[in-house]
Curated annotation (Swiss-Prot):
Disulfide bonds: C310-C325, C345-C354
Tissues in which the protein is found: Highly expressed in brain. Not detected in other tissues. Highly expressed in pyramidal neurons and in neurons throughout the cortex, hippocampus, the granular layer of the cerebellum and in groups of neurons throughout the brainstem. Barely detectable in dorsal-root ganglions.
Region: Scissor helix, residue numbers: 667-681
Annotated protein name in UniProt: Solute carrier family 12 member 5
Residue stretches of biased makeup (Polar residues): 46-55
Any one Gene Ontology BP term: chloride transmembrane transport
InterPro entries: AA-permease/SLC12A_dom, KCL_cotranspt, SLC12_C, SLC12A_fam
One GO MF term attached to the UniProt entry: ammonium channel activity
UniProt feature, compositional bias: Acidic residues: 982-994
Organism of provenance: Rattus norvegicus
Length: 1139
């Protein structure tokens, strides 16, 4: 459940008013912190926000005073400083752990007891828990063996390196922990909030796996103590000979380990509070055992304990099979053989055949614990690494060896090495003994002052444990015989725990103490690991783990406990403590490495929010700690290190792939920002090299009234061009003012982002609010991008229905867009019939992408189909390139040159040269030009005032009447409908009908009248300031004259304009129309069935009076083609033949 805190504002007059109901109305709880079931977000449902954010505190919304009346209207968003400070000062966070369980059990009758504020100090809250978690099974079961194998010098270096690693990590952790209020949840929250959801999830799961395998290691240590030192007779599997003892022991570990794991998981499931209450008992066992070791060291200096060991030559003998360390014994006056004789000879008789080594060497007995004053430290100073199956021998003892290659009988009672040892292996086995430094930060919610207690308690605990470990290395080497140290299971000292032989007053103190301490550590791991997994699951950054965020009603992570037990069982099935230890070393080292990385990144970035209260840190220390962790990972086991890093990398990429939506203000985001800033500043130094040129797209989309993208196919096409690996900015313009339309802009931006995510477009979204569309588009073109990372290509759709639009600003905006991209040296891509472009799910199984290379304005025409064919939609389409040859061109040579050029460009395409001979301008072209100019003339009239328009139309009518007497009427008529303005405007009536030529094959457009039988569009318009133009096509192919359609609206005047003489037409327009018609004929002939046609887009006229003619040219050029992309280069894009 969520915890809410209440900030109460009292009038300054009376403190007794707090009992008044009126004063209680100032206590306002944040509704976002009300109890709820499905807690999402930061993974800690009991954490209220400690950040200074006015939206998090609704205190002060009811204001009665007059002193601050100037700010009374802003009280809903800006609370009073007094209430804010009160809320921050009283901020508390409950611990994550067994508190939920205890609270649920203490709640009776639906009433909750008031939650006591945490009162734990540094000693009880941090120091002792860290001691309990750091001291563990390795200290009691393996440290003596490590010292015996590696020697005092190498063991000292090993312990020093490992302790330095944890000390440097603790310094980094202290800096992170004191950088603000520490939320309950500990190390995972510090890492995830410092490094972001991707690293946080990856490292959090590695930390969870490490904690889980630590539980397996503690359970295996418990079983080893139980079967090897407490109750050896409990072993289920017995070895028939010495060679089978190791396998039998592993099977016993698996069986008993599974049973102990089941019991521990049941205890954790039933009553977690008992685990926490017995934690001090387990800690007492650890401290008592360590004190017993030091007491034994002191006693051994003047009164060494009696633990004799038996040597045959220089070989160590196991005490399991005999009692007297001698070959012969005296019984009365008779010499008899001992049990040791029987182990090496065929019988107990003196004349029996005995082992050759046994015959040649004497049996001697020495003290296993000579004591600190014995000077043994010199002998144990250097290493004695062993291979598996080798007998443990004492250096310096006389021995008569055997011939080389003589096999050793494994049934003889020697002490054998059970594994091959080397330095890196010992590091992996030893390192888990220094883990557990996060115990204090994990209890941050219990602490009175976490920012003070965590650094002090953790560093003191590490210093204490490091001193114990380093001193133990020296003392073990100074007090215990080397062969005993190398005897892992104490076979030479009657099966006693080696470290127990040094303890005072009895070895049983160590045995029993270590047994309970390992049990307690295992229970703690099974308690903490599920809660860590629950926190990760509740964060929601790893979707498939969200089921483990649920649990019992009291908050216990039932499902997480079940998964933890299953993973822990994997470690138990491994069954070897020496094999499990390096595994958890990997996961803990990776966690510590990222703690150091987080501190180093935050320090180097110097973000304003990085203000740790702990001052004794530096980025060099964090970097050294990170490097040490990484080195130790590969020193311990390079293949385990690679596996751990692979697991973390897969988790990272999975979280990144699924889209981590958490924003925690983490250091990696800051690192990305700094890297982006550095890269952008580098890009500012100069334009990109030719080889680095790639299309950086600015996609201009239009949104409807509901802020949804009108043509999503534009973004599909953008996604299909993603092989360019360039920048993508999707922009849109909303008309209006920023103050009024800001919410709509936000909705439009969200809608565009959703569509970008659906179409898998990687890029940015930018919505601009402007008083008019023209200025907004211009702002986007000018200001899109940042620094050197700016767009160089604009992708826009062709303005549909531009003829029909009463507001002719639509196509004027488009032409201005073309001019601005040309002025800015930007490439322009215009998609015509964009609704017919394929979506990403579609696939073309055949077809072609046809490129009509008419003029060379850069390499865009070649590059675009190359990029498109990398996408699954266009992959099976072949590429065809057409170029146009004039009369004086050698078409054969042109084809060869183009083929060679494509070969050097590494582009595969079919090449064809189309010959377009000069021909006379057809009557069809003249008629198209005539219609275009008449329409242009009428469009100009629409921008005149009423009186100017009437005078202009009258002059056209008079001119037309004169033309009728000279020319025959044509078959298509033009009717101008002028709405009725006033009564005085209805004086003149048209004297006669004027008919103009309009070819039947002219391209249909939205402004064309429908076919006969359909109502023409727009006849009901009555806008008094507009003239409506209606074209009516011929009904018959015989081009018979057709009478005018009746006028339905009253008061409408029909004015007719007769076509001017053909010789009066603008010859430039005629030539351009001729080019458009001829090119269109050629393109349609060759590319009618192409899946996509790309061709050069001609530029707009320099004289703005011909803008509407430009639109007509483009319409004629692209008619009867399904999918067209007009490409206009900016002059900077280049496709190069060089590598």
């Amino acid at each position: 459940m969520s915890r809410r805190f209440t900030v109460t504002s009292l009038p300054p007059a009376a403190s007794a008013a707090s009992a008044d109901p009126e004063s209680r109305r100032h206590s306002v709880a944040d509704p976002r912190r009300l109890p709820r079931e499905d807690v999402k977000g930061d993974g800690n449902p009991k954490e209220s926000s400690p950040f200074i954010n006015s939206t998090d505190t609704e205190k002060g919304r009811e204001y009665d005073g007059r002193n601050m009346a100037l700010f009374e209207e802003e009280m809903d968003t800006s609370p009073m400083v007094s209430s804010l400070l009160s809320g921050l000062a009283n901020y508390t966070n409950l611990p994550q752990g067994s508190k939920e369980h205890e609270e649920a059990e203490n709640n009776e009758g639906g009433k909750k007891k008031p939650v006591q504020a945490p009162r734990m100090g540094t000693f009880m809250g941090v120091y002792l828990p860290c001691l309990q978690n750091i001291f563990g099974v390795i200290l009691f079961l393996r440290l003596t063996w490590v010292v015996g194998i590696a020697g005092i010098m190498e063991s000292f270096c090993m312990v020093f390196i490992c302790c330095s690693c944890t000390m440097l990590t603790a310094i980094s952790m202290s800096a992170i922990a004191t950088n603000g209020v520490v939320p309950a949840g500990g190390s995972y929250y510090m890492i995830s909030r410092s490094l972001g959801p991707e690293f946080g999830g990856a490292v959090g799961l590695c930390f969870y796996l490490g904690t889980t395998f630590a539980g397996a290691m503690y359970i295996l240590g418990t079983i080893e103590i139980l079967l090897a030192y407490l109750f050896p007779a409990m072993a289920i599997f017995k070895a028939e000979d010495a060679s089978g003892e190791a396998a039998a022991m592993l099977n016993n570990m698996r069986v008993y380990g599974t049973c102990v794991l089941t019991c521990m998981a049941t205890v954790v499931f039933v009553g977690v509070k008992y685990v926490n209450k017995f934690a001090l008992v387990f800690l007492g066992c650890v401290i008592l055992s360590i004190l017993a070791i030091y007491a034994g060291v002191i006693k051994s200096a003047f009164d060494p304990p009696n633990f004799p060991i038996c040597l045959l030559g220089n070989r160590t003998l196991s005490r399991h099979g005999f009692d007297v360390c001698a070959k012969l014994a005296w019984e009365g006056n008779e010499t008899v053989t001992t049990r040791l004789w029987g182990l090496f000879c065929s019988s107990r008789l003196l004349n029996a055949t005995c082992d050759e080594y046994f015959t040649r060497n004497n049996v001697t007995e020495i003290q296993g614990i000579p004591g600190a004053a014995s000077g043994l430290i010199k002998e144990n100073l250097w290493s004695s690494y062993l291979t598996k199956g080798v007998i443990v021998e004492r250096r310096g003892m006389p021995s008569v060896g055997l011939a080389d290659g003589t096999p050793v009988d494994m049934d003889h009672p020697y002490v054998f090495s059970d594994m091959t040892s080397y330095f890196t292996l010992l590091v992996g086995i030893y390192f888990p003994s220094v883990t557990g430094i996060m115990a204090g930060s994990n209890r941050s919610g219990d602490l009175r002052d976490a920012q003070k207690s965590i650094p002090t308690g953790t560093i003191l605990a590490i210093a204490t444990t490091s001193a114990v470990y380093i001193s133990s290395v020296v003392l073990f080497g100074a007090c215990i015989e080397g062969v005993v140290l190398r005897d892992k299971f104490g076979e030479a000292v009657n099966g006693n725990l080696v470290v127990g032989t040094l303890a005072w007053p009895s070895p049983w103190v160590i045995v029993i103490g270590s047994f309970f301490s390992t049990c307690g550590a295992g229970l703690q791991s099974l308690t903490g690991a599920p809660r860590l997994l629950q926190a990760i699951s509740r964060d929601g950054i790893v979707p498939f783990l969200q089921v483990f965020g649920h649990g019992k009603a009291n908050g216990e992570p039932t499902w997480a406990l079940l998964l933890t037990a299953c993973i822990c069982e994997i470690g138990i099935l491994i069954a070897s403590l020496d094999e499990v230890a390096p595994i958890l070393s990997m996961f803990f080292l990776m966690c510590y490495m990222f703690v150091n990385l987080a501190c180093a990144v935050q320090t180097l970035l110097r973000t304003p929010n990085w203000r740790p209260r702990f001052r004794y840190y530096h980025w060099t220390l964090s970097f050294l700690g990170m490097s040490l962790c990484l080195a130790l990972m590969f020193i311990c086991s390079w293949y385990y290190a690679l596996v751990a890093m692979l697991i973390a990398g897969l988790i990272y990429k999975y979280i990144e792939y699924r889209g981590a939506e958490k924003e925690w203000g983490d250091g990696i985001r800051g690192l990305s920002l700094s890297a982006a800033r550095y890269a952008l500043l580098r890009l500012e130094e100069g334009p990109p090299h030719t080889k680095n040129w790639r299309p950086q797209l600015l996609v201009l989309v239009r949104v409807d009234q509901d802020q949804n993208v009108v043509h999503p196919q534009l973004l599909s096409l953008t996604s299909q061009l993603k092989a360019g690996k360039g920048l993508t900015i999707v922009g849109s313009v909303l008309e209006g003012t920023f103050l009024d339309n800001h919410p709509q802009a936000q909705r439009a931006e969200e809608s565009i982002r959703r569509l970008m995510e659906a179409e898998k477009v990687k890029g940015f979204c930018q919505v601009v609010i402007s008083s008019n569309l023209r200025d907004g588009v211009s702002h986007l073109i000018q200001s899109g991008g940042l620094g050197g990372l700016q767009h160089n290509t604009v992708l826009v759709g062709w303005p549909r229905n531009w003829r029909q639009k009463e507001d002719h600003q639509t196509w004027r905006n488009f032409i201005e867009l073309v001019r601005e991209t040309t002025a800015g040296h930007l490439a322009l891509l215009v998609t015509k019939n964009v609704s017919m472009f394929p979506g990403n799910p579609e696939r073309f199984s055949e077809g072609s992408i046809d490129v009509w290379w008419i003029v060379h304005d850069g390499g865009m025409l070649m590059l675009l189909p190359f990029l498109l064919r990398h996408h699954k939609v266009w992959r099976k389409c072949k590429m065809r390139i057409f170029t146009v040859a004039q009369m004086d061109d050698n078409s054969i040579q042109m084809k060869k040159d183009l083929t060679t050029f494509l070969y050097h460009l590494r582009i595969t395409a079919e090449v064809e040269v189309v010959e377009m001979h000069e021909s006379d301008i057809s009557a069809y072209t003249y008629e198209k030009t005539l219609v275009m100019e008449q329409r242009s003339q009428i469009l100009k009239q629409m921008h005149l005032t009423k009186n100017e328009r009437e005078r202009e139309i009258q002059s056209i009518t008079d001119e037309s009447r004169g033309s009728i007497r000279r020319k025959n009427p044509a078959n298509t008529r033009l009717r101008l409908n002028v709405p009725e303005e006033t009564a005085c405007d209805n004086e003149e009536k048209p004297e006669e009908e004027v008919q103009l030529i309009h070819d039947q094959s002219a391209p249909s457009c939205p402004s064309s009248s429908p076919s006969p039988g359909e109502e023409p569009e727009g006849e009901g318009e009555t806008d008094p300031e507009k003239v409506h133009l209606t074209w009516t096509k011929d009904k018959s192919a015989a081009q018979k004259n057709k009478g005018p359609s009746p006028v339905s609206s009253e008061g409408i005047k029909d004015f007719f304009s007769m076509k001017p003489e053909w010789e009066n037409l603008n010859q430039s327009n005629v030539r351009r129309m001729h080019t458009a018609v001829r090119l269109n004929e050629v393109i349609v002939n060759k590319s009618r069935d192409a899946k996509l046609v790309l061709l050069n887009m001609p530029g707009p006229p320099r004289n703005r009076n011909g803008d509407e003619n430009y639109m007509e040219f483009l319409e004629v050029l692209t008619e009867q083609l399904d999918r067209v992309m007009l490409v206009r280069g900016g002059g900077r894009e280049v496709i190069t033949i060089y590598s």
